[in-house]
Structures are given as structure tokens and as C-alpha cells.
Amino acid sequence: MIPGSFDYHRPKSIADAVALLTKLGEDARPLAGGHSLIPIMKTRLATPEHLVDLRDIGDLVGIREEGTDVVIGAMTTQHALIGSDFLAAKLPIIRETSLLIADPQIRYMGTIGGNAANGDPGNDMPALMQCLGAAYELTGPEGARIVAARDYYQGAYFTAIEPGELLTAIRIPVPPTGHGYAYEKLKRKIGDYATAAAAVVLTMSGGKCVTASIGLTNVANTPLWAEEAGKVLVGTALDKPALDKAVALAEAITAPASDGRGPAEYRTKMAGVMLRRAVERAKARAKN
């Protein structure tokens, strides 16, 4: 499997990258870590004539706090996410999820922006970003705009990004101190996409669930924010009847493909299993 021929560009600034993408139009694709784009180029599912490599743009790298948000540059690697003490304290679910992406070699190159941006339903960050209520900063020829992660994904590899735009940063509201969290992922082997996965972030008070948010990975042609499933957990002790209702609501919105990871019915049920496990672990971690 060999990609088609292409011209290679390596801009030094966001402005230069946007100018290149605008000039080259639909024949160009931005290149982050390459672990989503290069495989589909090898199979000729993507045949860009130009690659715009973003790795020399320092403004796309870094983790900082702005008000009540954590802001992560799009070219920040998964390895850097795992090693960040700041994220471990503020958003530990990002570290937990990053550790389940591929393998250490890929995590040294793979970026949070690349994982989130291109609309691959098998990637782990999109559903997590929806669960966390994140927003994407998109920068293009008309300047920067903000799009909620829950509004960004339109279909497999189809997103709200416009021609000439780049995902430059991800803004994530910091959950309350003492929140519970978990990312549960079923996969066939190290490095594989999820058969099904679930992200859960919740808060507890007096033994009752106060807030709950759920994201589901690779069980539809987009990541899924299971809003209704989260709502039925609120006000409960997260006991079995409440979990049964949440699982049923989450399973009802899935539409996985039957593939080498299993038939659609199996993958739907595994989404429910992953959700149940994630809620139970998140509950155990939450402080009342």
C-alpha cells in the first residue's frame, strides 16, 4: 500500500499554513501526526496532491489554563498529554484515554488535534471531547471561530471545518474538584480501534448523582454524546435500575457497522457494557 504522489509543504506559522490551505484548496490536507491521514492515503481513500505539515508551528503546541478552561494546542502529542502533571490534576480522564490510544511509538507522534479533527469515528478523542463539553478553535482566512465538539461531527470523515481552516486549539471546561471519571475501551489488540468505548464524567453529592455526561466511541458513523442516558442518572444513587435505564438509552442511539470487530448487535451490547463499567468506576472515584 503506497500513497499517491503529493507535494510537501512545511509552514512556520498558523498564518502561513492557512494561506497555503486557502491557496491550494481541496487538493491540500493538513498533516499533524499522520496516524489518521497516512493510513487512508495508503489505501487511496484519500489522495491529496499537497500535504501541509504543521509540526514546525510552535503556536499549536502547549497546555495552559484560561479562566475556567484548559486550552490544549492542536499539535500537542498524546505523549505530552500523558506526561502533564497539570492535566493529571485538572482533567485526568485525558491521560487515561491517551494511554489507551494505539501504542507508545504512535503516541510520541500522534496529536490531540489530529485525533479530534478529521472525523474518524474510531478515534478516541472525539467522544471524550463531546463528553467534556469541549469546543474547537478553528482558524481560517476569515479569522478564528469556536465550534462545540458536539456540533462538529457530521458523518464519517465529514466535519464542520471549512476550506482553508485548521483546528488550532481545544478548549475544555475544567470539571469540578472531586468529579468522577472513566474511559472504558474494548479492543481486539494493542493499537486497534475500539470495538466500543465509553467516556463518563460525573459529580456526586450526598450519595446522589448531580451531573453526568457520556460519550460513545466507534458505535456510529460519528462519535455520540448520549445526552438522555446522562440525564436519567442525575438524582439517582447510580444503582442498577438507574444504570439499566442509562444503558438502554445509550444502546438505542448506536448504529455500529458489522465488521471484523463483530456484528452490529454485539458492538451495541458492548457499548452498554463499557458504559456500565465506566459509570461504576467514575462513581468510585467521585467525592461526595
From Swiss-Prot:
GO molecular-function terms, A-Z: carbon-monoxide oxygenase activity; FAD binding
Binding site for FAD: A32, G33, G34, H35, S36, T111, I112, G113, G114, N115
SMART domains linked to this entry: CO_deh_flav_C
UniProt EC number: 1.2.5.3
Keywords, comma-separated and alphabetical: FAD, Flavoprotein, Oxidoreductase, Plasmid
Domain FAD-binding PCMH-type, residue spans: 1-177
Recorded catalytic activity of this chain's protein: CO + a quinone + H2O = a quinol + CO2
KW Transit peptide (keyword) present: no
Record Pfam families: CO_deh_flav_C, FAD_binding_5
SUPFAM superfamilies the UniProt entry points to: CO dehydrogenase flavoprotein C-terminal domain-like, FAD-binding/transporter-associated domain-like
Cofactor requirement: FAD
Cofactor note: Binds 1 FAD per subunit.
Subunit architecture: Dimer of heterotrimers. Each heterotrimer consists of a large, a medium and a small subunit.
PANTHER family in alphabetical order: XANTHINE DEHYDROGENASE SUBUNIT C-RELATED
Function summary: Catalyzes the oxidation of carbon monoxide to carbon dioxide.
Protein name (database record): Carbon monoxide dehydrogenase medium chain
Source organism (scientific name): Afipia carboxidovorans (strain ATCC 49405 / DSM 1227 / KCTC 32145 / OM5) (Oligotropha carboxidovorans)
Gene: coxM
